[in-house]
A protein has these predicted regions:
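Active-site-proximal loop->helix
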Residues: 94-116, 139, 189-192, 210-224
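A short, aliphatic-rich alpha-helical micro-motif
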Residues: 117, 137, 238-240
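Positively charged, low-complexity intrinsically disordered leader regions
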Residues: 23-80, 84, 152
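Active-site cofactor/substrate anionic-group-binding motifs, chiefly glycine-
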Residues: 66-67, 71-119
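Glycine-rich phosphate/diphosphate-binding loop of Rossmann-like nucleotide-binding domains
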Residues: 72-84, 166-248, 253
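Anion-binding alpha/beta catalytic cores of soluble intermediary-metabolism enzymes, centered on
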Residues: 121-192
Length: 261
């Protein structure tokens, strides 16, 4: 967990036994599924587990548990990190390629969820649409993690800000400038930055602005945490004064036909 010092910066400290939080049986579909305190506790847990891994100390907290990894989109990092992560925690992952399931074609997304919940303790999906993620969660009694969809990429945002915090110690009052499309990554980052009190500047090409509904959600959160959100087509203006520059891919997955534009 974290404590707030007199100037408002969040400092990492070891959580007391009574302060342990639980996300048991909770889905992670969006950054909005997490409170600020849950984000802080996740970061503290991640730091603890990373320290154990670096010291080669076993931390098999998911001994005997299984993870289903459902992929409609290929990914090196998503598959590698989830598969290694569950292994280091003592569990086991099963990887499903697109042709293994064919979500919504060979059988409905709901039926897939009903089957998976009987065999697995946890489901991670990397899929085309947010509706697929939602349908899996609505029909599953085991937790579903959004490993990427067209609307959000919450796991990437969490690991990115955790890494930034490792280097800068505090996030509150810092500014992250994102240069790229207003896509799923930008959506999750702007929501998460707002939650932790970090300013977020987004520079995107005309016609590739973020979802207005998500911008409104982030602005509402930012108003409560004292952070600021700016969206512009001017990368130089958005990068000026930033503590972190974040550049995404120039052509988002699924938009390859627009590369020449």
């Amino acid at each position: 967990t974290f404590s707030e010092n007199p100037v408002g910066a969040w400092e990492l400290r070891q959580p007391a036994r009574t302060e342990r939080f639980t996300m048991q049986n909770k889905h992670l579909l969006s950054i909005n599924d997490l409170s600020r305190s849950e984000v802080q506790s996740l970061f503290a847990t991640a730091q603890e587990l990373k320290s154990l891994r670096n010291k080669r100390i076993p931390h098999r907290r998911l001994e005997g548990h299984t993870l289903a990894m459902i992929f409609e989109k290929p990914s090196l990092r998503t598959r590698a990190t989830f598969e290694i992560g569950i292994f280091q925690l003592g569990g086991q992952a099963v990887y499903f390629q697109p042709h293994d399931i064919r979500l919504g074609v060979r059988e409905t997304v709901a039926d897939v969820a009903h089957n998976m919940e009987r065999w697995f303790d946890l489901i991670m999906c990397r899929v085309f649409t947010n509706q697929t993620v939602r349908t899996l969660a609505e029909n599953s009694r085991v937790p579903v993690i959004n490993g990427l969809c067209d609307k959000e990429h919450p796991c990437q945002a969490l690991t990115d800000l955790f890494t930034i915090q490792e280097h800068m110690e505090t996030l509150s009052g810092r500014t992250l400038a994102f240069i790229g499309d207003g896509n799923n990554v930008a959506h999750s980052l702007m929501l998460l930055c707002a939650k932790v009190g970090m300013d977020f500047n987004l520079a995107c090409p005309p016609g590739y602005e973020p979802d207005p509904d998500i911008v409104m959600q982030a602005e509402s959160i930012a108003a409560a945490t004292g952070s600021h959100l700016r969206v512009s087509n001017d990368p130089v203006a958005m990068a000026k004064g930033a503590d972190v520059l974040y550049a995404d891919v120039w052509v988002s997955m699924g938009q390859e036909d627009e590369a020449q534009d």
